Each structure stands twice: as structure tokens, then as C-alpha cells.
Amino acid sequence: METQSPSIIRRFATATWAHIRVDPLLFTCFFTLSFAVVWPFWVGEFLPFLDIPQHLATIGVMHHYDDAAFDHAAYFLVDTSSTQYLLYYLTCDLLADWVGVEDANRVFISLYAVLLPLSVAYCLGAWGRLKLAALLAYPLVFNKFLFFGFINYVFAFPFLFFGLGLMKCMLDSLRTAPGRST
């Protein structure tokens, strides 16, 4: 009986973790810098991003839409088909059940801050480059787009690098596929 190959998501997650955990120094640097880059999101009372108050208000309306105490349904209509922030809003809305709207926002932004360097490390590893160079992605977490509050835009950066690395892995697997003549 022929065994099936592991799913692409499992291979992706295993390869991402393998790119980091092989080198203890690299793992320590990633862990320390991830803490350092996430810490500013949690120490202040307010995040210094331009559009965050409007995003928090929108997430708050979505989260308390059916709550009679707020009566948002009388004044607002939630239309999820006309926003480019859908992943951000829905994720924060789900997280808000456990941690509140503001902390859900902090969790989402922290996730971006950790995923960006990890995705760069995955991409560099897939292309056979020095994974240590991914540490240079940490200063890039704090960019103009983040401070303007374009959360959906900056959250796409990790997907870009994960996608480039995944594309390289898939191209390599096609080249080495059994029965493929080169």
C-alpha cells in the first residue's frame, strides 16, 4: 500500500520550525528579539498608530453589535463585503471574547511582529541563503505603514515571504518528482 505524503501545511510548518531550531544561537536571537519587538505593543496604555482608534471602534461595534446594552444595531450596519480589513476585524472580534477589544488588537499586531522575521527566515532558508540575515527583519517591523495604522497591509508581509519560500519548495519538489524527466 502506498503511503500518502504529508499535507502541504504540515510540511510548511515543519520546515519553518526546522529553519529556526537547528541553530541554538539563532533560536535564542529570534526568541529574544521577538520579545523585544512585541514588548512596546503591551507597555503603553494606547498604541501610537494613526488609524487604530477607528479600527478599534469598528471592531467594538462588530463585537457588541447584538448586545442590547450598546444598541449598535440601531445605528450601524455591519457589511463585511466592503472592507479590506476583514481578516483583521474578524480575528480581533473573535479574540475579543477572551481578552477584550484593545488587547485583541495588541495580540493581532504582536502576531504580525513575530511572523515577519519568521517568514523571512523561512524564505531565506528555502532559497538556500543565510538564515541569520532574517534577524535584519526585526527593525522592519516598525515601519511607516504600521504607524499609519495600515494593519491589513503590514500583516500581508509575512504571507508574502512565506509564499515565496513555499513557492521555492514546491518548485524544488516538482524538479525532483519521480517520473519527471529533466
Model regions and ranges:
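Short hydrophobic/aromatic helix or loop-helix immediately within or flanking a transmembrane segment
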Residues: 57-64, 76-101
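Membrane-interface starts of transmembrane alpha-helices
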Residues: 25, 100-108, 130-133
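Extracytoplasmic loop-helix module adjacent to an early transmembrane segment
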Residues: 39-71
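Transmembrane-helix motifs of polytopic, lipid-linked glycan transferases
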Residues: 107-126
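Short acidic/glycine- and proline-prone juxtamembrane loop motifs at membrane-interface regions
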Residues: 148-156
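Membrane-interface transmembrane helices that cradle and orient dolichyl/undecaprenyl
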Residues: 128, 163-181
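Start-transfer (signal-anchor) and selected internal transmembrane alpha helices
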Residues: 1-38
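Transmembrane-helix signature of polytopic, membrane-embedded enzymes
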Residues: 120-142
